[in-house]
């Protein structure tokens, strides 16, 4: 049996990470790949479109009902979705109580011990990326995920999160085999977005794997709890996800050790691309507005 490809999608909350990952994985199945998704986001929305349902019951919530995780069976937590993709959500605690990363650690250990990784070509971790704390870094830190794909956009906070995630990868790249597979830009139609995404990828010693164009068909599919590949398989957007899946499939062993940049360098980059303004520019604009009002 060939080695399992263990990949992870990281990205800041609200960037479209779970939507992008599920559409990409649905396209990977078309390439004949067997897939297990492990959702590592407390929102537990990493498998919704694959299962065509509301959020899946999580390992932590089921363990709480059963008494402990040892009282669970694999079939309690693992559901089969679109084209037999295996789906698991690790879950998290109530807001303000405990560490959400604990669910990730508990889930991965349980799944490995109970044979969930048997007979799959890919394991995909869908991970919250605003905070690269110990728990959320678990797939990286414990040498589970080998290829990290960062979902980002041309917005400042998405770029900031992408750079932070690169720092997390760098921290563990020396002790394990984890590498940055590349950046995936989810178009938000900001100024010079494609150029900026390519420039950041280059600065991080990586590449822009794919630029996913914005298309309302994604929202139409989501409202029906489906991936675009299921909802509109012949659409241009479905083909974008197929192209992204093909690029990831052909990217095995091509990941890099990232070179994250400082906050100052990131701000300089944003100034260079006209996304941020200098203090002088902002003062000049303010003076012009005040002058216009005075007239």
Swiss-Prot record:
Protein name as annotated: Nitrogenase iron protein
Keywords assigned: 4Fe-4S, ADP-ribosylation, ATP-binding, Iron, Iron-sulfur, Metal-binding, Nitrogen fixation, Nucleotide-binding, Oxidoreductase
Location of ADP-ribosylarginine modifications: 102
Co-factor binding details: Binds 1 [4Fe-4S] cluster per dimer.
Oligomeric form and interacting partners: Homodimer.
Function: The key enzymatic reactions in nitrogen fixation are catalyzed by the nitrogenase complex, which has 2 components: the iron protein and the molybdenum-iron protein.
A UniProt-annotated Pfam family: Fer4_NifH
């Amino acid at each position: 049996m060939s080695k399992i490809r263990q990949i992870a999608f990281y990205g800041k909350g609200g960037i479209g990470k779970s939507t992008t990952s599920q559409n990409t994985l649905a396209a990977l199945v078309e390439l004949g790949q067997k897939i297990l998704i492990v959702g590592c986001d407390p929102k537990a929305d990493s498998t919704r479109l694959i299962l065509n349902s509301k959020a899946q019951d999580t390992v932590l919530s089921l363990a709480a009902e059963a008494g402990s995780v040892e009282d669970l069976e694999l079939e309690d937590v693992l559901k089969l979705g679109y084209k037999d993709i295996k789906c698991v959500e690790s879950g998290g605690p109530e807001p303000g109580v405990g560490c959400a990363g604990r669910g990730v650690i508990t889930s991965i250990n349980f799944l490995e011990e109970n044979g969930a990784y048997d007979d799959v070509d890919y394991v995909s971790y869908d991970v919250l990326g605003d905070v690269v704390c110990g728990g959320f870094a678990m797939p990286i830190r414990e040498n589970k995920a080998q290829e990290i794909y960062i979902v980002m956009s041309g917005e400042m906070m998405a770029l900031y999160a992408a750079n932070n995630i690169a720092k997390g990868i760098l921290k563990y790249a020396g002790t394990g085999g984890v590498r940055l597979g590349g950046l995936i830009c989810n178009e938000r139609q900001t100024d010079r977005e494609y150029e900026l995404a390519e420039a950041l990828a280059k600065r991080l010693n990586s590449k822009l794997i794919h630029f996913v164009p914005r298309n309302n068909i994604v929202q139409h599919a989501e409202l029906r709890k489906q991936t675009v590949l299921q909802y509109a398989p012949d659409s241009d957007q479905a083909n974008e996800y197929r192209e992204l899946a093909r690029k990831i499939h052909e990217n095995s062993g091509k990941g890099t050790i990232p070179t994250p940049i400082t906050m100052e360098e990131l701000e300089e980059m944003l100034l260079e691309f006209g996304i941020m303004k200098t203090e002088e520019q902002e003062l000049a604009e303010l003076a012009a507005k005040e002058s216009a009002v005075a007239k």
